[in-house]
């Protein structure tokens, strides 16, 4: 609204003017950023979930349950996250409504950190996606190197963390041009894990496959899904140029964890693909946009062969 200007019109007593836009001339305090737990990383299920819970009014250790407390919280106690959120409360008004609120600002921050962009970022809200993205990006200045110690740096040597594992069941192992295949995507983790959720990317080659229907089998803590261009090459494969992003989070700190009642094992969703002209064979891959604190991620490649019969 008002070209991005957050305030009322400006008047000299006879003429009212609404600016067409605005920029922030003063840099933010370097401590005002979304790395709430001081790991030198921005993460939905660590930083974002703690912020969302904090905006709902949760305090102390209930903020960080299943999210990890990070190096600074370990040093200074569980109330550190609460203090950081309180200190940057007004800056967390990411939709610039004049009111910092869990159901709007907290959810938008979570969606952004999971990787949602554009219309899917603001679905259900009246905010401008462009303005929300620009505002949140200001709260994410470049950080130093990842905290090297386990479990904050999940790729640290000899980390050996428990894993959130994703596997796929295929309706058929081979398809031809015009043929369809359905993927059933399943999740598992050690049954004693207290999970916060998962941000999941399924990478594919859009020159060979058209994505079809997507059915969320798991409604617990689900966020919108979105197909995005893989400009960052998250899976390390130059052949896959797009990915399907799906996300889940356990908001409540009272619950034992996401999927706990299902022993951390569940079907996440089903998705179908159709082979395009020129199809021979292809490999789809997984990567994670966010995992539960103290867990790493693994997802096996999905090889779909070629059959002239479709």
Language-model region placement:
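Acidic, low-complexity intrinsically disordered segments
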Residues: 1-26, 129, 134-310
